[in-house]
Amino acid sequence: MSANRSQVCNYKTRNRKERQRCLWSVQCLTLLLLAALGCVSAAAQSVAYVPTHKSNSVAVVNTATNSVIDVIPVEIQPLSGAMSPNGQEVYVTNSGWIFGSNSVSVINTLSNTVVATIPVGNFPVGVAFTPNGAFAYVVNSNANSVSVIDTATRTVVSTINVGASPWGVAFTPNGAFAYVTNQSTNDVSVIDTATKSVVATVPVGNNPVGLTVTPDGAFAYVANYLSNSVSVISTATNTVVNTVPVGATPITVAITPNGASAYVPNDGSNNVSVINTASNTVTATIAVQANPRGVAITPDGAFAYVSNRIANTVSVVNTATNSVVATVMGVALFPEAVIIR
């Protein structure tokens, strides 16, 4: 009987210790899981990067609070930028050619620090990544060319000649073609990305600047700065199939993820034209602040962020109501563009 009581006691003690160890393991695993989820949540958080031309920096905006949470120094006169498809890097063009910039700053989005600087051509402006993230195309406005950067080595591997004073660049979703606006020749160069050569030239309006391609790849929307219009190019035929009148001096275009609406900042009339892409008509005009230049849509399509160059602010537009619901202050001098992760 005594032996049995001892065995029972040892059994209970052993079970209690095992339960404690098990509980400790579960607690540790829970903490690790919460930490991992916190990291994933931080990485997945929607953030806007705003190059500020006169401050030689990039403001980082938390889109949940619409406040500036960081400022990243870059080189002279940053003008535009693009987010890598995996969301890990932002490429920012530094256009201060007079001061010897002519470069691209590579920002790590986890640390919000510049991890590389890539020399490119004279007066780099527009930049875009291929959909697979393998290459970035940088438009060199004073060199009438496009620098092709291998994103793995962060080096220029090719240079493509285009029209005069090129500005913007956008890819078809399959990555087969890049569309580049040429301001001085009033046209768009179509680049075959396999051969890295121009295969078509599409006449558009006067002084084309920014552009984007619809999510289905069927059309390219081109902002014509001096024509106060947007040219709609069929990517199947590389011809203009529609021209949409907008506000004064439109500068760029962003399209919602569902492809239903195009948002066009008009820096001469201090507003944003909203185009219904099914009818190619303006269905709303949204007043913002002085000299709107850049625009980007959040991944869920709920908001458009518009940089106001002279006001030194960013207007936050609710795309459901097409009204300004917030204004981001403190983004420094001359915000030129918006890039959203």
Predicted regions span which residues?
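Intrinsic disorder/low-complexity segments in short proteins, especially the signal peptide
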Residues: 6, 28, 39-42
